[in-house]
């Protein structure tokens, strides 16, 4: 092996960026169903929950899918299904924690952009709480997360009130030395 001379200066470390995209959607259960509506880790009162094996949090699920598109590790449909089957875990917070754990030690979350489409529930009053909860689970600053909400003018099933869908774009910084 060749020895590096002491006068040799290594280049500054480099950061590369990886971008993941995730999507998820779920249909509402009947209004009389007691399952709570959870979005971004926040319970929405007076709105039915979602048809799902888990708690149905489409925001956390879209984020998990965005992580999977960066890390190539299946969280939903893979690890989450296994956690449900073996331990009965339906809490999407646990799935999202597993997604964060799937990052390499050289990777960190830089930014998260989230768009939620649905006629109900009314999201605007809860957006700050949702951002705070996501920041807590991901261990990132609040200003690294933005959430927009739209009804889509009623053009889709989501905008007509049948369910909610979420899209997420995740930016990961990765430390590399060349």
From Swiss-Prot:
Q: Which Pfam families match?
A: YgbB
Q: Gene3D superfamilies in the record, alphabetically?
A: 2-C-methyl-D-erythritol 2,4-cyclodiphosphate synthase
Kindly state which reaction or reactions the protein catalyses. 4-CDP-2-C-methyl-D-erythritol 2-phosphate = 2-C-methyl-D-erythritol 2,4-cyclic diphosphate + CMP
Does the record bear Lyase in its keywords?
Answer: yes
Q: Which UniProt keywords apply?
A: Isoprene biosynthesis, Lyase, Metal-binding
**Necessary cofactors:** a divalent metal cation
GO molecular function terms attached to this record: 2-C-methyl-D-erythritol 2,4-cyclodiphosphate synthase activity; metal ion binding
Q: Known InterPro entries for this protein?
A: MECDP_synthase, MECDP_synthase_CS, MECDP_synthase_sf
**KW Cell cycle (keyword) present:** no
Q: Where is this site: Transition state stabilizer?
A: 53, 151
State how the cofactor is bound. Answer: Binds 1 divalent metal cation per subunit.
GO BP terms: namely: isopentenyl diphosphate biosynthetic process, methylerythritol 4-phosphate pathway; terpenoid biosynthetic process
Copy the pathway line from the protein's UniProt record.
Isoprenoid biosynthesis; isopentenyl diphosphate biosynthesis via DXP pathway; isopentenyl diphosphate from 1-deoxy-D-xylulose 5-phosphate: step 4/6
Q: Where, by residue number, does a divalent metal cation bind?
A: 24, 26, 61
The UniProt record gives the binding positions of 4-CDP-2-C-methyl-D-erythritol 2-phosphate as: 24-26, 150-153
The EC number of this protein is 4.6.1.12
The record's listing under NCBIfam families reads: ispF (TIGR00151)
The family annotation for this protein states: Belongs to the IspF family.
Record's function text: Involved in the biosynthesis of isopentenyl diphosphate (IPP) and dimethylallyl diphosphate (DMAPP), two major building blocks of isoprenoid compounds. Catalyzes the conversion of 4-diphosphocytidyl-2-C-methyl-D-erythritol 2-phosphate (CDP-ME2P) to 2-C-methyl-D-erythritol 2,4-cyclodiphosphate (ME-CPP) with a corresponding release of cytidine 5-monophosphate (CMP).
- How the protein assembles, per its UniProt entry? Homotrimer.
This protein is called 2-C-methyl-D-erythritol 2,4-cyclodiphosphate synthase
């Amino acid at each position: 092996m060749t020895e590096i001379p002491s006068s040799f200066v290594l280049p500054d470390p480099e950061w590369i960026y990886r971008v993941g995209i995730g999507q998820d959607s779920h249909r509402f259960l009947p209004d009389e169903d007691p399952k709570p509506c959870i979005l971004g880790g926040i319970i929405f009162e007076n709105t039915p929950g979602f048809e799902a094996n888990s708690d149905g949090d489409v925001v956390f699920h879209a984020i998990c899918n965005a992580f999977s598109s960066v890390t190539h590790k299946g969280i939903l449909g893979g690890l989450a299904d296994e956690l449900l089957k073996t331990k009965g875990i339906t809490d999407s917070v646990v799935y999202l924690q597993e997604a964060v754990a799937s990052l390499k030690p050289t990777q960190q979350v830089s930014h998260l952009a989230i768009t939620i489409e649905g006629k109900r529930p009314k999201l605007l009053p809860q957006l700050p709480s949702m951002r705070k909860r996501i920041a807590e689970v991901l261990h990132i600053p609040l200003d690294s997360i933005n959430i927009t909400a739209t009804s889509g003018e009623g053009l889709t099933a989501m905008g007509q009130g049948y369910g909610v869908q979420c899209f997420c774009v995740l930016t990961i910084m990765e430390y590399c030395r060349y």
